[in-house]
Regions:
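Glycine-rich loop-to-alpha-helix module at the N-terminal edge of alpha/beta enzyme cores
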Residues: 43-131, 138
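Generic secondary-structure signature for well-ordered alpha-helical cores
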Residues: 13, 68-76, 95-99, 127, ...
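Conserved beta-strand and immediately adjacent loop positions that scaffold enzyme active sites
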Residues: 33-35, 104, 136
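Active-site-adjacent loop/helix segments that line or gate small-molecule/cofactor pockets in enzymes
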Residues: 1-32, 82, 195
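Active-site and channel-lining beta-strand-loop segments
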Residues: 25-46
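Short coil/turn connectors at secondary-structure junctions
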Residues: 40, 100-103, 132-135, 149, ...
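PLP-dependent aminotransferase-class I/II
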Residues: 142-216
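Electropositive phosphate-/nucleotide-binding environments in soluble metabolic enzymes
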Residues: 26-30, 57, 61, 84, ...
Length: 216
């Protein structure tokens, strides 16, 4: 099936060259297990589980039935000063899978939102301890940490940052550990050992008591 430009016009796709995509659109119409299927019937291996959020696969009847059962009860219960029992049950189950000490669960909708939330937790944690001056975050060049403003600021991918202004203040990037001269080296490389101390270098430069977290 061919779609004209008018049909494709209104959806502004994220992380995509919209003009190029709409000139030659590739649309998925269904999924089953680890595969997705295009409108032409082409089978595509979903090797990244969607955006890492379909780990159980596509078109699982038991998941669809559970979602439908919940939608018949309530489509959404806001979590601000209110909740519903299944949220607590899910948090309890997740906490049984995590290491000791990591037993409080905060639900978010995406990895990008998780990074934003983690930064807020770090800010609030240090503020509560009387160390509100800890407002600097250390990340790494070429890192990717999401599409929200906090994630873009932490990310070290130039093309993902250059059109979005200065970003969140107080973000410092460690140098990337990949060096061209080490690409074919076997064993311990002879160059780049100083990069292992980059976090310490940054801490000493700005002051260890100004750093809120290191994001890796």
């Amino acid at each position: 099936m061919k779609y004209d430009l008018e049909f494709l016009e209104n959806y502004w796709m994220p992380f995509t060259s919209n003009r190029d995509f709409k000139a030659d659109p590739r649309l998925v119409v269904r999924g089953e297990g680890v595969y997705m299927y295009s409108q032409e019937g082409e089978r595509i291996l979903d090797g990244s589980s969607g955006l890492f959020c379909c780990a159980a696969g596509h078109s699982r009847p038991e998941i669809a039935e559970a979602v439908y059962a919940q939608l018949k009860e309530a489509a959404y219960v806001p979590p601000f000063q209110l909740s519903q029992p299944l949220a607590f049950e899910l948090a309890r189950r997740v906490s049984q899978l995590t290491p000791d000490g990591l037993d409080h669960i905060f639900f978010v909708n995406s990895g990008s939102e998780a990074v934003d939330t983690a930064m807020k937790v770090a800010y609030a944690y240090h503020y509560a301890r009387g160390e509100g001056q800890r407002q600097r975050f250390v990340s790494r060049e070429r890192a990717y940490h999401g599409v929200n403003m906090a994630g873009v600021s932490l990310s070290g991918m130039i093309k993902n940052r250059q059109v979005f202004g200065p970003g969140i203040p107080g973000v410092v990037h460690m140098r990337h550990t990949w060096l061209p001269e080490n690409r074919f080296v076997k064993g311990q490389p002879e160059t780049g050992i100083e990069l292992a101390d980059d976090l310490e270098r940054i801490a000493m430069n700005y002051g260890p008591d100004t750093i809120a977290a290191c994001v890796v």
